[in-house]
Amino acid sequence: MLTTSCPLDLLDEYIPEDKVSEDKIANGRRAVVRMRSVLGDDAFRNCKAELPVAIGRTFGNKVKVFDLAKAPHLLIAGATKQGKTVAINAVVASLLYSKHPSELKFVFLDPKGCEFSAYSRLGGHYLATLSGENPIVQTKDQAGKTLEALCEEMEARYSHLSVGSISNIVEYNKQASTPQERWPYIVTIIDEYADLTIPAGREEESRYISREITESIIRLAQKGRAVGIHIILATQRPSKKVITDSIKATFPTRIAVRTMTRTDSRVILDSPGAENLAGGGDMIFKIDTETERIQGSYISPEEINRLTTYVESQSCKKTPYTLPEPDSAPKA
């Protein structure tokens, strides 16, 4: 991690195991699964994944960990206030506890302007940004430019791979002569995807930006894995207009929190079921064709503030990561 590892006591005390076991399920809902309990579990601590994510506990009370690097992207969808943002925060916390700033950068796109403000504290440690832009992307125009810059970053990395006859980021980093030459993984988190991709009104410029954003996301999802660029896409509007066939084809790993209708569940998972979830972080996790019901890890806003404040306070050398300017030459 940083100067020292992020201590688990930044997070609230775990709930004893007997409080979250199957026989404690009441009224169709499980007890809260604290983030601290899953991050302290051997399933996460001993995981050898490149980008381990402790998403929650199964209904057999086992910690569920998956590798975002293999996922390689994640779609999170469902009705409002059913656990979508909490799932995103669990992903971020998992990665902060497992990767050094030199190994990982985040890009946050927050069109609502209220979900990711605490993560601005990650600043020069964990964020990748355009030069001179806000650390948390909030406007549609800035989102379009940032995604275009990520596409250029991706193509620049592919150019390096082709020169060295290397196939992926893991091989590239193993052959790097110095730590400074290694590439960090870049995890781009997009909250309320629909706000960025559905044009506002009939203005041609708005339609153009929406189209460019969609095309950039699909391009990154199709090619980003090999060079360490991964997308997490979230929406509370799981309609076919938002979650298109192209999006579904490039996001085989999905999380559905409770949906309003059976149809919404089918849009997310290709099957019903999410409409019957209990809410409060109760979710269905799908990877390829396999599905599993999970009680999502919960991290409170207070815990997020403590965690990001701790990262901000660390005195180790900061490693800011500046994305290439859109339409500029790829950086060396």
Per-region residue spans from a language model:
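Generic structural signal of hydrophobic/aromatic residues within well-ordered alpha-helices
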Residues: 35, 122, 169-172, 265, ...
